[in-house]
From Swiss-Prot:
Residues 1-11 have a biased composition (Basic residues). Residues 102-272 form the CP-type G domain. Its EC number is 3.6.1.-. GO terms for cellular component: cytoplasm. One of several proteins that assist in the late maturation steps of the functional core of the 30S ribosomal subunit. Helps release RbfA from mature subunits. May play a role in the assembly of ribosomal proteins into the subunit. Circularly permuted GTPase that catalyzes slow GTP hydrolysis, GTPase activity is stimulated by the 30S ribosomal subunit. It holds the Pfam family RsgA_GTPase. One of its GO terms (molecular function) is GTP binding. This is Small ribosomal subunit biogenesis GTPase RsgA. The lineage of its organism: Bacteria, Pseudomonadati, Pseudomonadota, Gammaproteobacteria, Enterobacterales. PANTHER family: SMALL RIBOSOMAL SUBUNIT BIOGENESIS GTPASE RSGA, SMALL RIBOSOMAL SUBUNIT BIOGENESIS GTPASE RSGA 1, MITOCHONDRIAL-RELATED.
């Protein structure tokens, strides 16, 4: 079955966006080869439409054009670029080529399919907090994304200074579910600095990206870790009514930690969409379920109350945490609902 056809309004918007991109391309500053210096290595600090900020090996960041032959360029890409002998309209060079990526962070896009948003990530830092609430479902969604992308996760629970002793014990018990699965878990407070040295050590010599819903303190943590002072990543107050903050960043950007290591701050990872995945990919994304895949009595087992279900039997024995089992089914149900809203069938992915 084919994907649902775009409405006339959607077709007009797609066409208008295409024409606007063409117009921007035509207005780019063009370089003659004689105007350019020798090829150099660099890393993409940020991407702005038809331009990119490139950090050279000398640490200087220059805004560059992008060769039309480059089909994909995102923050974190390692590139070959050439500086101009002089700046033209604020542009200081051109990106010539992109090195192969060892990892790429993607998110699903309704119009463009799977869209890359960052490259060469070593780990995804999943930031959660006890306020507005501790959501294991959100943590599990991020873990499925990490496992699917094959990028190592690090769970960071923020705002622990707001916990009393009894609440701390309950939260610790919840985190033990992930520790038992060999996931790294850190309990921190950007306010009291508790756990910050351990977090700095986990970030050293790696390229990380922070993920988490608004209001969990990602920007506050980054400001503290980066020691930005007055040059801060924007932080919004948490809404008194909803308990949720607002978006605080607009473009992906790479920053260097003073203690070593890098971080890509990206608005595209507030919440990973999973609707493009197949149910089998979600099952594999729960690492404790993998050993039972293919062991059920029926091939089309839904892993609920189906007779002969190996996964449900493991849950009943206590080999699979009830919380994780329930979140697994919640994720599958939410994927079905999103696909229905977006007009996809189960065979369209």
């Amino acid at each position: 079955m084919s994907k649902k056809k775009l409405s006339k309004g959607q077709q007009r918007r797609v066409s208008a966006n295409h024409q606007r991109r063409l117009k921007k391309t035509e207005s780019k500053v063009e370089w003659e080869d004689s105007q350019l210096g020798d090829a150099q290595e660099g890393i993409i600090i940020s991407r702005f439409g038809m331009h990119a900020d490139v950090e050279a090996t000398d640490g200087v960041v220059r805004r560059c054009n992008i060769r039309r032959t480059i089909s994909s360029l995102v923050t974190g890409d390692r590139v070959v670029w050439r500086p101009g002998h002089e700046s033209l309209a604020g542009i200081s060079g051109i990106v010539e080529a992109v090195h192969p990526r060892h990892s790429v962070l993607t998110r699903p896009d309704y119009y463009d399919g799977i869209k890359p948003i960052a490259a060469n990530i070593d780990q995804i830092v999943i930031v959660s907090a006890i306020l507005p609430e501790l959501s294991l479902n959100i943590i599990d969604r991020y873990l499925v994304a990490c496992e699917t992308l094959e990028v190592e996760p690090l769970i960071v629970l923020n705002k622990i200074d707001l916990l009393d002793e009894k609440s701390r014990q309950l939260v610790d018990k919840s985190m033990d579910i992930y520790r038992a699965l060999k996931y790294r878990v850190l309990m921190v407070s950007s306010h009291t600095q508790q756990g910050i040295p351990e977090l700095e050590q986990a970030l050293t010599d790696r390229i990380s990206i922070f993920a988490g819903q608004s209001g969990v303190g990602k920007s506050s943590l980054l400001n503290a870790l980066l020691a930005l002072g007055e040059k801060r990543i924007l932080v919004n107050e948490v809404s008194d009514n909803s308990g949720l903050g607002q978006h605080t960043t607009t473009a992906s950007r790479l920053y260097h930690f003073p203690h070593g290591g890098d971080v890509i701050d990206s608005p595209g990872v507030r919440e990973f969409g999973l609707w493009h995945l197949e149910p089998e990919q979600v099952t594999s994304g729960f690492i404790e379920l993998r050993e039972y895949i293919g062991s059920c009595k029926f091939r089309d087992c839904k892993h609920e109350n189906d007779p002969g279900c190996a996964i449900n039997a493991a849950r009943e024995r206590g080999d699979i945490a009830r919380e994780r089992f329930d979140n697994y089914h919640r994720i599958l149900e939410s994927m079905t609902q999103v696909k229905m809203r977006k007009g996809f069938s189960d065979t369209d992915n």
